[in-house]
Amino acid sequence: MAIISMKQLLEAGVHFGHQTRRWNPKMAPYIFTERNGIYIIDLQRTVKKIEEAYNFIRDLSRDGGKVLFVGTKKQAQESVKEEAERCGMFYVNVRWLGGTLTNFQTIRRRIERLKELERMEEEGTFDLLPKKEVAHLRGEREKLERFLGGIKEMKSLPDALFIIDPRKERIAVAEGRRLGIPIVAIVDTNCDPDEIDYVIPGNDDAIRAVRLLTSKMADAVIEGQQGQDQPEEEAVVE
């Protein structure tokens, strides 16, 4: 069964690229035509590229690999959080903090501080402190939760990144490339596909398009997880 259909892609508006004056010539192989000043993405290429990305994520997940979902633009925030949580993976959906990957130990210390504040509140320590100090600590906890909540349980570097709009998330892309972490991304007509290992040519601005493509990557994770405990079938010798 096909992972995704042309009909689904069309209905979600995945084929709409950016205005022709805002394009990266490297995306030319993925462009079907131009209509009313907007590039139309070749969905036949998109279907194939989704399958490649899906298979990569599924196999990675089957081997116990972890994926970090990244999308901080408004159109992506909700989908990234919901789909990452649905498949039990990590996410960054508010702001990418520089060094999230390349300075991971420092980020881990901030996460430990977040967990410490959570413990203090759960254990009733806040009840023993002056109101002003409690307000300050709660503010600190909320800020840390906002930026780091999606990677709170990420004990080590991820095995792959799934990125919505690599142009906007260029710091995440740069960190992933520097560390040799494979990158899967929704790449619109204004992005550089050369920086991405698994390019999914598509509209990165429409909420429905982003949700559809993100959900497919989450499906790949889940399929991989379901295959983890199943031993491979032994070859039958005649």
From Swiss-Prot:
<keyword id="KW-0689">Ribosomal protein</keyword>
<dbReference type="GO" id="GO:0003735">
    <property type="term" value="F:structural constituent of ribosome"/>
</dbReference>
<protein>
    <recommendedName>
        <fullName>Small ribosomal subunit protein uS2</fullName>
    </recommendedName>
</protein>
<dbReference type="InterPro" id="IPR005706">
    <property type="entry name" value="Ribosomal_uS2_bac/mit/plastid"/>
</dbReference>
<dbReference type="GO" id="GO:0006412">
    <property type="term" value="P:translation"/>
</dbReference>
<dbReference type="GO" id="GO:0022627">
    <property type="term" value="C:cytosolic small ribosomal subunit"/>
</dbReference>
<dbReference type="Pfam" id="PF00318">
    <property type="entry name" value="Ribosomal_S2"/>
</dbReference>
<dbReference type="InterPro" id="IPR001865">
    <property type="entry name" value="Ribosomal_uS2"/>
</dbReference>
<dbReference type="InterPro" id="IPR023591">
    <property type="entry name" value="Ribosomal_uS2_flav_dom_sf"/>
</dbReference>
<comment type="similarity">
    <text>Belongs to the universal ribosomal protein uS2 family.</text>
</comment>
<keyword id="KW-0687">Ribonucleoprotein</keyword>
<dbReference type="InterPro" id="IPR018130">
    <property type="entry name" value="Ribosomal_uS2_CS"/>
</dbReference>
